[in-house]
Structure formats: C-alpha cells, structure tokens
C-alpha cells in the first residue's frame, strides 16, 4: 500500500448506478438492503447483491439455452508475510519499552493469531494444494460454492439438459493457484448437488479436488490470454506461435504493463495521491489508542525502522513445527506506514473469520480511518486497473478486449447452432474483472476522469468493494424461443444489471433486463 492519499470524503455508500429506463435509476452492484461499509475495499467478502427469488420473469416463450460466467477468486489470506511481521517487530519493541496502552497490549496476541492463521491457511483442507500464505480462506471457498448453488437454482432446466450432453460444461482459469482452487470448489459444489454433472465437465482435471489433478493449457483448462491478460510475458506466453487475436491481446498487455510501469501521467497522479496532508492526522487516530506518544514520535529514526525480517513459528494440528520467514523488503519508517500496514490486516480479516477464531481487528481501525485508506486504495486501483484518466486512451480496458469478444463468441455459437457447451465457467482475478467491467462500459460505473481532476469519493462513484469484491462475478444467461430469437441477460455480482445506456434500444421491452442479442452485439460493435 503506497502512502498516502489526496482525498475528499463523502458518505459511506455512494453506489454505482445504471439506468433502469430513460428516467429511472437502477443500481447494478449495490445490494437491495445495504449495510454500512466496512471499507475493506477490494478485499470485501462476497455477498450476492439480489435475492434469487426477485429476478425479473423470463419473457413468455423463451427457454434458457446457455450461461457463462467470469469470476474472481474468493476471499483469501495475506499474499505473503509482510505487514504482519513488520508490525509484530514494531510491537515487540514497544512492548520492551513499556510503550503500549492496554489496547496495544492486546495487539500482540492478535498479530500472532494473524500470522498463525496465514501460515496454516488451508492446512488439511481438501482442494488446497499447499497450505500457507495466499490461499483461499474458508469464507472464500464457501463464496464460490454459494455462487454455484444459486446458479443451479436459477437455471434448473438448463443444467438438467447439461446432464444429458457430453462435455456440456467447460471450465477455464488463469492457471494461478487461487483461481484454479476457486474453479475446483465451484465445480465440486455442482457435482455435490447434481452428481450426474461430473462426467459432463471438461477438462476432467476440474472434477477432482485432489492436488494430483493438475490443469494445463494443453487440455484447455488454462487460458492466460483471456484470464491473465494483465501480465502476459515472453517466457510464458510466446513459446508457441500466436493467433492474430492472441497477438493483439499480447500487444495490449505489453502496452498496459508499460503504462503501469513507465507512464509519466500515471506516476504523477499516484504521487499526487500519496502527498496527503491528512495522512499524519489519520495515522495518529489509529496509533494513539495503541502506543504511547513518545514511541510513535520515534518511528523512522535510527533503530525505529521495522521491517518484515526474522521469522515466526507455529505448531500444526499434527504437531509439526512450521516456520515462515519474512523477506525484509517491507518497512515501517513512519507513523503513516504503521497505520497503513494495520489497515491491510484489518481489511484482510473480513474474509478470514473462521481462521482468526474470533480475533477482531475492527477495534484497531476507526471507521473514518478505514474509509481514508480505502479511498486511497480505490484511487490507486481506479487509475492503475480501472477507468483511469481520459488521456490514457483506454489502455487499462483494451487488455480485456479478447475476453469481451469471447463472451459474445460463445453466444454467436448458440445463434449459429454450433455451441458444444451449455455453460462456460471462467475463474480469474481482480485484474481481469475490473478491466472487463470497464470494457463493457456498465452505465455510470466506469467513467474515466480527465487528468485535471483527481479521483476521490466526491468526484467518482467507482468503488472497489462494489466493482471487485472477493469472488466478484459477471454472468450472462442466454434464452431462445421457437422463432430463433436470442436474448441475453446480465448479472453483476448476481444482481440483474443493464448494459451501457447507449444499448437501451436493444432491450427486449421497456424496463426489461433482457436484451435482443443481435442488437446488443451491434451496439458493442463486435465483429
């Protein structure tokens, strides 16, 4: 997390909007009954955004014939031993100097619980290949199982038909551990609920939670060009000759990576965000309840820079001693750093309730401070992954063009009566979901800002917790009637969602969430 933020605060729940008709607004990602934000940002645990029983009825004469999904992996633990160990080293020094408040005394045990939970994350859990940092939590596993359950309930007739058709369910992922695991837990739930589906899922490697069941590009279970397009590279992705479409995606990926690493306008904007006069004040609101003032003032001076050096050991459920070492690359050199690191633990804790066993990091993070750090992270994501600034010429969303085209290509196969599958299920990452949502231009969600403006909760409705919470997903259900008319209906985080407003003419009727597919394809100028 970069430190820290040019911000202007607004109320907790400014929600993304899509018009329901020309005069009426409809929120595509805000829940029907909203609860106050915890400001976990993109680490927000997943919740379906609409009641399954409140979806708009299917137009008379139409039957579901196909569905497709793109989903982010579920809730996870910390990616590596960074913030937790650095804070623990800081805490131990404060303890040695008797510089802790009564609440600060409690922080030590909670940091130990956080490290233990991450070191053992996934231990003994079927479907987790190697326990430890970076794995999905039990919350994350249940998120994808829940989405699978509701998909079966939403489209019972479609999956009944799928159970009679060979290779009717195609599953793909980025090939990265968390995405692969999410795919396997999703398909495991499909199989648990409807065992007859097991022989109809392809590739077969997705039908087993066993670690010996390995995915590959060769069996079609991994597609980096569609599901890891933000990070394509020569060593991994140019081993085989590329198709024209793959070459275009690869070129877009290189342009995006150059933008992220080299673009002067982006660097200047992120620097502007980092120079926030409120950062020190907010940091003190976090640290003053935990540490004595004289200790906080020493942070950054000689002997008071704390890194993720050293190690921490835990005892596994089988009695083994397991030790995790820090890499020493993450340092706390100021009060601002310390508070921001604590926010990272707070934000990840929401998706680790089972593993943390009642440990509550809420008490260490005032709501206003959480909002401050969430706004800063949202600003960084907005510029680096999301709509960005107008002058960036859509470089952050051009990388999703191949995936967007594939969504339409799968429906084209239905129209042409060439579709071999009843469902195509794809599992990826926030870096995929965010550009895809931007590329589809979901109404009033994805506007870039001119460089002269700076992202804040005042200037934009874009929110990471709404666009890409854990297990964020976009789904298209496809319907046909006997006359061969094809309709598409979109769900974003399981809420009926409209396409961009310029496509309103493609809606099947006024106020309908169903779109005439051929008109929609024309609207998006898909060839």
Regions picked out by a protein language model, each given a short descriptive name:
Residues 27-170, 174-424, 428-527:
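Signature for phosphate-centric chemistry
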Residues 16-18:
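C-terminal motif of bacterial Sec signal peptides marking the signal peptidase cleavage site
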Residues 13:
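A conserved catalytic-loop motif detector
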Residues 20-22:
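Bacterial signal peptide processing site
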Residues 2-10:
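Sec-dependent signal peptide recognition
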């Amino acid at each position: 997390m970069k430190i820290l933020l040019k911000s202007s605060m607004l109320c907790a729940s400014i929600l993304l909007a899509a018009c329901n008709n020309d005069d009426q607004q409809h929120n595509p990602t805000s829940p029907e009954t909203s609860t106050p934000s915890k400001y976990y940002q993109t680490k927000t645990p997943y919740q379906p955004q609409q009641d399954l029983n409140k979806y708009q009825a299917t137009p008379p004469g139409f039957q579901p014939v196909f569905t497709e999904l793109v989903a982010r992996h579920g809730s996870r633990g910390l990616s590596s031993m960074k913030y937790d160990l650095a804070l623990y080293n800081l805490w131990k020094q404060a303890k040695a100097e008797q510089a802790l408040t009564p609440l600060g005394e409690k922080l030590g045990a909670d940091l130990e619980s956080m490290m233990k939970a991450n070191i053992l994350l996934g231990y003994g859990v079927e479907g987790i290949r190697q326990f430890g940092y970076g794995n999905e939590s039990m919350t994350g596993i249940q998120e994808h199982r829940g989405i699978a359950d509701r998909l079966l309930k939403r489209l019972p007739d479609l999956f009944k038909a799928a159970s009679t058709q060979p290779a009717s369910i195609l599953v793909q992922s980025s090939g990265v551990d968390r995405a692969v695991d999410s795919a396997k837990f999703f398909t495991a739930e499909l199989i648990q609920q409807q065992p007859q589906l097991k022989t109809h899922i392809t590739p077969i490697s997705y039908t087993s939670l066993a670690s010996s069941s390995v995915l590959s590009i060769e069996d079609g279970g991994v597609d980096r060009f569609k599901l890891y397009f933000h990070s394509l590279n020569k060593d991994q992705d140019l081993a085989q000759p590329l198709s024209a479409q793959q070459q275009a995606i690869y070129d877009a990926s290189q342009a995006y990576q150059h933008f992220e690493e080299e673009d002067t306008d982006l660097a200047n904007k992120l620097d502007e965000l980092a120079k926030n006069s409120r950062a020190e004040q907010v940091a003190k609101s976090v640290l003053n309840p935990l540490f004595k003032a004289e200790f906080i003032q020493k942070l950054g001076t000689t002997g008071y820079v704390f890194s993720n050096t050293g190690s921490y050991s835990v005892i596994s459920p089988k009695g083994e001693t397991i030790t995790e070492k820090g890499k020493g690359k993450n340092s706390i050199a100021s009060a601002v750093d310390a508070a921001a690191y604590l926010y990272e633990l707070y934000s990840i804790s929401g998706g680790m309730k089972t593993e943390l066993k009642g440990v509550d990091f809420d008490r260490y993070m005032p709501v206003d401070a959480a909002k401050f750090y969430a706004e800063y992270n949202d600003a960084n994501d907005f510029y680096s992954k999301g709509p960005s600034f107008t002058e960036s010429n859509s470089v952050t969303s051009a990388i999703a063009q191949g995936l967007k085209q594939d969504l339409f290509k799968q429906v084209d196969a239905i129209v042409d009566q060439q579709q071999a599958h009843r469902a195509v299920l794809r599992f990826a990452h926030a870096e995929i979901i965010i550009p895809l949502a931007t590329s589809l231009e979901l109404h009033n969600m994805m506007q870039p800002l001119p460089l002269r403006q700076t992202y804040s909760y005042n200037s934009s409705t874009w929110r990471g917790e709404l666009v890409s919470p854990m297990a964020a997903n976009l789904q298209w259900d496809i319907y046909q009637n006997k006359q061969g008319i094809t309709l598409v209906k979109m769900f974003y985080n399981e809420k009926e969602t409209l396409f961009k407003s310029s496509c309103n003419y493609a809606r099947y009727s006024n106020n309908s969430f169903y779109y005439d597919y051929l008109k929609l394809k024309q609207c998006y100028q898909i060839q």
